[in-house]
Amino acid sequence: GWTVVSDTTYPGYRAIPIDVMHGYGVMSREVVAQMGAEPPTHVFVQAGVGAFAASVAAAFWLAWGERRPRLVVVEPLAADCHLRSAVAGKPVVVTGALDTIMAGLACGEVSPAAWEIVSTAASAFVALDDRYARDAMRRFAEPLHGDPAIVSGETGAAGLAALLAAQRHAPLSEL
Protein backbone atom coordinates (compact mmCIF):
# COMPACT_ATOMS: atom_id res chain seq x y z
CA GLY A 1 0.00 0.00 0.00
CA TRP A 2 0.92 3.61 -0.48
CA THR A 3 -0.47 7.02 0.31
CA VAL A 4 -0.49 10.04 -1.98
CA VAL A 5 0.75 13.18 -0.21
CA SER A 6 0.07 16.20 -2.39
CA ASP A 7 -0.96 19.82 -1.99
CA THR A 8 -3.49 19.48 -4.81
CA THR A 9 -7.09 18.54 -4.09
CA TYR A 10 -9.27 16.61 -6.50
CA PRO A 11 -12.58 14.78 -6.13
CA GLY A 12 -12.27 12.28 -3.30
CA TYR A 13 -8.90 13.64 -2.17
CA ARG A 14 -9.07 16.67 0.07
CA ALA A 15 -7.93 15.91 3.64
CA ILE A 16 -4.21 15.42 3.01
CA PRO A 17 -3.80 18.50 0.78
CA ILE A 18 -5.57 20.59 3.43
CA ASP A 19 -3.06 19.26 5.98
CA VAL A 20 -0.20 20.18 3.63
CA MET A 21 -1.65 23.69 3.28
CA HIS A 22 -1.78 23.98 7.07
CA GLY A 23 1.89 23.01 7.10
CA TYR A 24 2.67 25.77 4.60
CA GLY A 25 0.88 28.16 6.94
CA VAL A 26 3.58 27.68 9.59
CA MET A 27 5.91 29.92 7.56
CA SER A 28 3.28 32.62 7.28
CA ARG A 29 2.55 32.52 11.00
CA GLU A 30 6.28 32.97 11.62
CA VAL A 31 6.21 36.05 9.38
CA VAL A 32 3.22 37.40 11.30
CA ALA A 33 5.01 36.85 14.61
CA GLN A 34 8.06 38.75 13.37
CA MET A 35 6.06 41.58 11.80
CA GLY A 36 4.01 42.30 14.87
CA ALA A 37 0.94 44.49 14.74
CA GLU A 38 1.85 46.40 11.57
CA PRO A 39 1.35 44.33 8.40
CA PRO A 40 3.23 44.98 5.17
CA THR A 41 1.28 46.72 2.42
CA HIS A 42 1.89 44.05 -0.24
CA VAL A 43 2.93 40.42 -0.39
CA PHE A 44 4.09 38.85 -3.66
CA VAL A 45 3.63 35.09 -3.47
CA GLN A 46 4.36 32.41 -6.04
CA ALA A 47 1.68 29.98 -7.12
CA GLY A 48 1.78 26.65 -8.89
CA VAL A 49 -1.48 24.96 -7.88
CA GLY A 50 -2.06 27.76 -5.36
CA ALA A 51 -1.78 25.84 -2.08
CA PHE A 52 1.13 27.91 -0.76
CA ALA A 53 -0.51 31.18 -1.86
CA ALA A 54 -3.76 30.12 -0.18
CA SER A 55 -1.96 29.33 3.07
CA VAL A 56 -0.25 32.73 3.03
CA ALA A 57 -3.56 34.46 2.33
CA ALA A 58 -5.35 32.59 5.11
CA ALA A 59 -2.66 33.27 7.70
CA PHE A 60 -2.56 36.97 6.90
CA TRP A 61 -6.34 37.22 6.83
CA LEU A 62 -6.55 35.61 10.27
CA ALA A 63 -3.77 37.79 11.68
CA TRP A 64 -4.68 41.17 10.27
CA GLY A 65 -8.25 40.94 8.95
CA GLU A 66 -9.18 43.97 6.86
CA ARG A 67 -5.69 45.40 7.44
CA ARG A 68 -4.07 42.43 5.69
CA PRO A 69 -1.60 43.17 2.89
CA ARG A 70 -2.57 43.15 -0.75
CA LEU A 71 -1.82 39.65 -2.02
CA VAL A 72 -0.22 39.55 -5.47
CA VAL A 73 -0.19 36.01 -6.88
CA VAL A 74 2.76 35.36 -9.20
CA GLU A 75 3.13 32.59 -11.76
CA PRO A 76 5.02 31.88 -14.98
CA LEU A 77 3.53 33.18 -18.20
CA ALA A 78 3.73 29.67 -19.68
CA ALA A 79 1.55 28.23 -16.89
CA ASP A 80 -0.76 31.11 -16.00
CA CYS A 81 -3.72 29.12 -14.67
CA HIS A 82 -4.41 31.55 -11.81
CA LEU A 83 -4.53 34.63 -14.01
CA ARG A 84 -6.70 32.88 -16.58
CA SER A 85 -8.96 31.50 -13.85
CA ALA A 86 -9.36 34.97 -12.34
CA VAL A 87 -10.31 36.42 -15.73
CA ALA A 88 -12.77 33.58 -16.40
CA GLY A 89 -14.21 33.65 -12.87
CA LYS A 90 -13.71 29.90 -12.54
CA PRO A 91 -10.80 27.42 -12.66
CA VAL A 92 -9.19 27.18 -16.08
CA VAL A 93 -6.70 24.51 -17.15
CA VAL A 94 -3.65 25.66 -19.12
CA THR A 95 -2.49 23.00 -21.56
CA GLY A 96 0.63 22.59 -23.63
CA ALA A 97 4.28 22.23 -22.75
CA LEU A 98 4.22 24.66 -19.77
CA ASP A 99 7.89 25.35 -20.50
CA THR A 100 9.36 27.65 -17.87
CA ILE A 101 12.49 27.82 -15.75
CA MET A 102 10.11 28.22 -12.79
CA ALA A 103 9.54 24.46 -12.92
CA GLY A 104 7.94 24.23 -9.48
CA LEU A 105 5.20 26.55 -10.70
CA ALA A 106 4.58 24.83 -14.05
CA CYS A 107 1.33 23.23 -12.94
CA GLY A 108 -1.26 24.59 -15.35
CA GLU A 109 -4.19 23.89 -13.05
CA VAL A 110 -5.30 25.34 -9.73
CA SER A 111 -6.06 23.15 -6.75
CA PRO A 112 -9.80 23.50 -6.09
CA ALA A 113 -9.37 23.94 -2.31
CA ALA A 114 -6.64 26.53 -2.81
CA TRP A 115 -8.69 28.36 -5.43
CA GLU A 116 -11.54 28.78 -2.93
CA ILE A 117 -9.18 30.99 -0.89
CA VAL A 118 -6.96 32.53 -3.56
CA SER A 119 -9.84 33.66 -5.77
CA THR A 120 -11.24 35.67 -2.88
CA ALA A 121 -8.05 36.83 -1.19
CA ALA A 122 -5.84 37.88 -4.10
CA SER A 123 -5.66 41.54 -5.02
CA ALA A 124 -3.90 40.85 -8.31
CA PHE A 125 -2.53 38.06 -10.48
CA VAL A 126 0.73 38.47 -12.40
CA ALA A 127 2.12 36.09 -15.03
CA LEU A 128 5.78 36.67 -15.81
CA ASP A 129 8.24 35.81 -18.53
CA ASP A 130 11.22 33.76 -17.33
CA ARG A 131 13.63 36.68 -17.75
CA TYR A 132 12.18 38.27 -14.62
CA ALA A 133 12.92 35.14 -12.60
CA ARG A 134 16.52 35.23 -13.87
CA ASP A 135 16.82 38.90 -12.88
CA ALA A 136 15.39 38.17 -9.43
CA MET A 137 17.79 35.28 -8.83
CA ARG A 138 20.66 37.57 -9.81
CA ARG A 139 19.40 40.29 -7.44
CA PHE A 140 19.15 37.77 -4.60
CA ALA A 141 22.71 36.58 -5.29
CA GLU A 142 24.10 40.11 -5.65
CA PRO A 143 21.95 42.30 -3.37
CA LEU A 144 22.17 46.04 -2.98
CA HIS A 145 23.15 48.13 0.04
CA GLY A 146 24.99 45.43 1.96
CA ASP A 147 22.04 43.06 2.32
CA PRO A 148 23.03 39.40 2.68
CA ALA A 149 23.07 37.26 -0.45
CA ILE A 150 20.33 34.67 -0.83
CA VAL A 151 20.68 31.48 -2.85
CA SER A 152 17.35 31.01 -4.59
CA GLY A 153 16.03 28.94 -7.42
CA GLU A 154 13.75 30.22 -10.11
CA THR A 155 10.54 29.25 -8.35
CA GLY A 156 11.61 30.85 -5.09
CA ALA A 157 12.51 34.07 -6.86
CA ALA A 158 9.05 34.54 -8.41
CA GLY A 159 7.83 37.02 -5.80
CA LEU A 160 10.87 39.26 -6.18
CA ALA A 161 10.57 38.84 -9.95
CA ALA A 162 7.08 40.35 -9.85
CA LEU A 163 8.24 43.21 -7.64
CA LEU A 164 11.08 43.99 -10.05
CA ALA A 165 8.67 43.80 -13.01
CA ALA A 166 6.31 46.18 -11.20
CA GLN A 167 9.13 48.70 -10.86
CA ARG A 168 9.79 48.56 -14.62
CA HIS A 169 6.26 48.60 -16.01
CA ALA A 170 3.77 51.34 -15.21
CA PRO A 171 0.61 49.16 -15.26
CA LEU A 172 2.14 46.79 -12.72
CA SER A 173 3.20 49.64 -10.45
CA GLU A 174 -0.49 50.15 -9.64
CA LEU A 175 -0.63 46.82 -7.79
Q: What positions do the PLM features span?
A:
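Short internal beta-strands
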Residues: 70-76
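Short helix-capping segments at alpha-helix termini
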Residues: 62-68
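Small/polar-residue-rich loop-to-helix segments that shape phosphate-bearing ligand pockets
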Residues: 1-42, 81-127, 133-134
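Active-site-adjacent helical/loop segments in soluble small-molecule enzymes
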Residues: 27, 39, 110-175
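Active-site nucleophile and cofactor-binding loops and adjacent substrate-binding regions
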Residues: 20, 45-49, 73, 128-129, ...
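Short glycine/serine/threonine-rich phosphate/pyrophosphate-binding segments
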Residues: 46-57, 79-83, 154-163
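Short glycine/serine- and small hydrophobic-enriched flexible loop segments
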Residues: 33, 58-62, 161-168
